[in-house]
Curated annotation (Swiss-Prot):
Record key words, sorted: Antibiotic, Antimicrobial, Cleavage on pair of basic residues, Disulfide bond, Secreted, Signal, Toxin
Entry superkingdom: Eukaryota
Organism field: Urticina eques
Propeptide residues per the UniProt entry: 19-27
Entry protein name: Tau-AnmTx Ueq 12-1
Length: 74
């Protein structure tokens, strides 16, 4: 059971949960200080990129929403 949780945890960290197990998408995960979460096309527009946790710096013109799921334009 513990090993299963470890494997699932590793898959979650790699972002497979957002792609449906194995199907990799072009969506980038955002980490604190990491640039390139996409470019802002309009104010307050949220992209589908994943954030490591809420309200981290997702690049110069992005922030993470409270759910930690999206990068939004400032």
């Amino acid at each position: 059971m513990c090993l299963l949780m470890l494997v699932l945890g590793a898959m979650y960290v790699q972002g497979w949960h957002s792609a449906g197990f194995g199907k990799r998408t072009l969506k980038k995960r955002c980490y604190p200080g990491q640039p390139g979460c996409g470019h802002c096309s309009r104010p307050n527009y949220c992209e589908g990129a994943r954030c490591e946790s809420g309200f981290h710096d997702c690049g110069s013109d992005h922030w993470c929403d409270a759910s930690g799921d999206r990068c939004c334009c400032a």
